[in-house]
């Protein structure tokens, strides 16, 4: 769910997911999808593509369990869809951390209508 995703992003990046990524670029947060503005935005594009592959669970609402061991996210689920959902969220949180250097405040409140059409997933 969005709750676990936000928690993972905070653990990996030290940033509040809603304030920092809620409307960042063309792909982060709610709304459309478009050509990524930078590496940070590309993390969110890949994340949305990951969600599109899920079948049998709702990425925004369904809760899953994970643990934080030695500064590492460990997904733990018996349900295959929830495990994949956790892995999607883990991947974006790590990607955002790895690309903190590309985070550009000018894209923090980027208007989605100005986004160019993205390539399909």
Swiss-Prot record:
Disulfide feature: 26-115, 28-44, 43-95, 49-121, 50-88, 57-81, 75-86
Stretch list, region Important for membrane-damaging activities in eukaryotes and bacteria: 105-117
Entry's Gene Ontology cellular component terms: extracellular region
Any one GO biological process: arachidonate secretion
Keyword DNA damage in record: no
Signal peptide limits: none
Keywords linked to the UniProt accession: Disulfide bond, Myotoxin, Secreted, Toxin
Tissue specificity of this protein: Expressed by the venom gland.
Residues carrying the site annotation Cationic membrane-docking site (MDoS): 112, 117
A Pfam family that the UniProt record links to this protein: Phospholip_A2_1
Subcellular location, record wording: Secreted
Site (Important residue of the cationic membrane-docking site (MDoS)): 105, 108
InterPro entries noted in UniProt: PLipase_A2, PLipase_A2_Asp_AS, PLipase_A2_dom, PLipase_A2_dom_sf, PLipase_A2_His_AS
Assembly behavior: Homodimer; non-covalently linked.
UniProt xrefs under PANTHER family: PHOSPHOLIPASE A2 FAMILY MEMBER, PHOSPHOLIPASE A2, MEMBRANE ASSOCIATED
Similarity-based family: Belongs to the phospholipase A2 family. Group II subfamily. K49 sub-subfamily.
Protein name: Basic phospholipase A2 homolog blK-PLA2
The species this protein was found in: Bothrops leucurus (Whitetail lancehead)
